[in-house]
């Protein structure tokens, strides 16, 4: 018998891959019944601001404001698609551990649906992939999303 995941976590970072994961999570939750829920999380990596000499709180506030607008849009989209149990949180700290361990333990998450990494090989080598870490260290099942709702490979985003 297939697992009926009831509490799905979707990390949202504004990337196309995260959007694909969100859309698939909504579809899975709707299939799994009225008690199924989607919780999105955006993690503001405060370590990224530590090396900026002119750091002030307005930078974190701007990042938080942008994340909140994106997450509000996703909540509205999910509700318009018929999923009532959808919410989000914005966390501050190290994305890897917050996504893999902290939020799943706190909320009883049974599935993390995360977008495939958007990093290139050099970036993965230097800073490591959040997706890779989550797949190795999560306290629950993890599904890495690489395709759209029709299971077609995601097109490569055009460089600006």
Task: Write out the residue ranges for each language-model feature.
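Acidic, proline/glycine-rich short linear motifs
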Residues: 42-69, 152-160
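Gly/Ser-rich helix-loop-strand patches that form or flank binding pockets
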Residues: 4, 104-153, 159
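Short, solvent-exposed amphipathic alpha-helices that sit
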Residues: 24, 63-74, 98
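General small-molecule cofactor/ligand-binding pocket signal
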Residues: 39-41, 87-91, 143
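Short beta->alpha linker loops
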Residues: 55, 90-94, 117
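Small/aliphatic-rich secondary-structure junction motif
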Residues: 2-53, 81, 160
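Structural beta-alpha unit
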Residues: 1-3, 76-112, 149-160
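Short, well-ordered secondary-structure micro-motifs
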Residues: 21, 50-53, 98-101, 124-126, ...
